[in-house]
Each structure stands twice: as C-alpha cells, then as structure tokens.
Amino acid sequence: MLSLQTLAKKVVACNYLSSDYDYTLQRFGLWWDLGPIHLCNNCKQIFSYKHLQCFSEDDLCLEAALVKAVKSDNLELIRLFVDWGANPEYGLIRVPAVHLKRLCTELGGLTPVTEPRLLEILKEVAKLKSCAGVLLGYDMFCHNPLLETVTRTTLDTVTYTCSNIPLTGDTAHLLLTKFWFALALRHNFTKAIHYFYKRHKNHLYWRVACSLYFNNIFDIHELCREKEICISPNLMMKFACLQKKNYAAIYYCYRLGASLDYGMNLSIYNNNTLNMFFCIDLGATDFDRAQHIAHKAYMYNLSNIFLVKQLFSRDVTLALDVTEPQEIYDRLKSYTSKNLKRAEEYLTAHPEIIVID
C-alpha cells in the first residue's frame, strides 16, 4: 500500500501544473534533470513538461527511469519509482554500488539475479518497443558481467527470438550492440539510431542491412541524403528481398539503380512470391532466368507460369517517380499485385498445368 506522501506525489505528478509551481515541485521531490516529473496515469510513462503528449522519444517507462535514477545515485527517486510500480530488480542488473544494491534489495529486488531471470528481463526490455527501452537495454546489458556465465548459444537464441534477425559478433558485447541497434532500426527510433551510429560508425553495413530488412526506408533515405552509403544498389536489394512484403524497401533500391530482374530472382530463391510479383509489377522481364530458378527450386507451378511470358506486364500505376519515404509508404499502402491476380486466374483456367506435391 502506498504511503500518503507517495500517493500525494503520484496525484500531483499525474496533473499538469504551471511554472509557478516549479519551486514547490522541487521541494516536493518531483524534479529531475532541470524539469518537473510527470507521470501518465494511462501508459505509466514518465516525461517532462516540454512534452504534452505521451510516446515521444524522450519518454521513460518506470523501469528505465529507475535505472537512470540508480546511475545518478538518486536514492529519493529510486524509492519513488519503485513505489509507483517500477521493478526493483532492474536496478540490480547493472551491478550497482553496494549501497544502491542494498536499497534495491530492501525495496523488493531479489539477489543474486539468476540467469533465467536475467534473460527474462532482457526479453521484457526488448518488448517495450520504445526509444527509451532500446537505450535502456543497451545500457543494462552491454558490458554486463552478469552475462559472462550465459552461453553463447543461449544468448544467440534469445536475441534471435526477440529480433527475428540472425545476429553475428565475436563477443557478447558486439552481439548485443547489433541486437539493440537492430531493434532501433526496426521501429525507426531516430534518437536511438543516431546514438548507436555516433558510437559505432563501423556498423554502417549493419545499419543499412537492418533498415532494408525491416522495410525502414526513412533511415535509408537519411543515409542517402547525407551521402553515407557506399554499398551497391543490388546488394541493398538483396537485403530488401529477405523479408515478405518489403515493397517500400524494394522500390527504394530500384530507384537507386538496383536491377528488378535481380530482385525477382532473389525473391524466388527466398521463396518469397509476393516480393517476386512486386518486382514484376515494377517491370522485371527476365522470365527465362526466373523459370530456370523456380524449376531448380522445385517450384514447378511457378516454373510453368513463367513459360507463359505474355501473361505478365508492368503495372503502370506503380510508376511512382517519388523518393520521399512517407509518400512511398502512402502510395503502396493499398497495393495489390495485378500480375499475381493474372497468374491465379490462369492457373484456375488451366488446372492441367498444376503440379500437386
């Protein structure tokens, strides 16, 4: 049960007050980083008064706020955030000083933090889907001695499950850096992306690969505008074709000069027919090569369809001629493949060519 003082602080923090009350809020313990603390009663995010809406990139979940308070050795705020619902175990992950560890334990944190619980917290942080959550995860887990006992196989499995992207790295630190960077790129958390890239300039290739894999052309557009990319458009197309329905990324690579025939063939290799038909809709025409690849991949129905070359043609409505990311997303929002529809109609009308596995 919350004490009367803690409850009063929570009520005050959940309401906006004018700057006339700044001194009172400071004396009341609701002041942090040169500004008053505000707690959203609905989403439990903590943010400053400069934001009058939740879910900005500077918002902090209670756990992220707790870790930040532990780092700054702010005992009063540690107690306050735990009283408001933050899990005190999060304060123990970074192996804090003895007095901070003792406080977090007194507030309910269990020590020692077991390996299963450590990995469970890693997954919890990854699921926060916020800029602050990504930066929190990087801060908590990279260079963390608690992870030294975790096997590489276990860590690989956990990070792949959370990101759905194969990760590589010689060390656990490098693996986790790529992991949190990938999550920032997946959700286009620009503040986190810039934070990582400023510290890890050597990860440009990884940044491009992840952005294309996650269909994040906002980030690719920014890199192109700043002339940071020195990777061939066809190699970029390779990353874009790995994920299903990566239409915006495929289109952007095409606008940069990537071959649509290459994208079509890559999509067949990846058993990704929706991306393949998108490339055809954009203007891919090398159906002889596509038929050969489909046949070698035992995709006989697709191989037979490619024998009817006159079936396919470019979709003129996709002649977008735009490069602004938001406009590309908007134009493709209602996209459906005309060539896919023709192929389905042809198979329905000619059941004799269908090969049943």
Swiss-Prot record:
InterPro entries (alphabetical): ASFV_MGF360
Keyword Nucleotide-binding set for record: no
Domain of life, source organism: Viruses
Principal location class: host cell
A cellular component annotation (GO) from this entry: host cell cytoplasm
Localization in the cell: Host cytoplasm
Keywords from the UniProt entry: Host cytoplasm, Host-virus interaction, Inhibition of host innate immune response by virus, Inhibition of host IRF3 by virus, Inhibition of host RLR pathway by virus, Viral immunoevasion
Pfam hit, one: ASFV_360
Keyword GTP-binding: no
Gene Ontology biological-process entries: symbiont-mediated suppression of host cytoplasmic pattern recognition receptor signaling pathway via inhibition of IRF3 activity; taxis
Task of the protein: Plays a role in virus cell tropism, and may be required for efficient virus replication in macrophages. Also inhibits the host cGAS/STING-mediated type I interferon production by inducing host IRF3 degradation through the proteasome pathway.
Family: Belongs to the asfivirus MGF 360 family.
Known partners and oligomeric status: Interacts with host IRF3 and TRIM21; these interactions mediates degradation of IRF3 through TRIM21 and ubiquitin-meditated proteolysis.
Protein name, UniProt field: Protein MGF 360-14L
Organism: African swine fever virus (isolate Tick/South Africa/Pretoriuskop Pr4/1996) (ASFV)
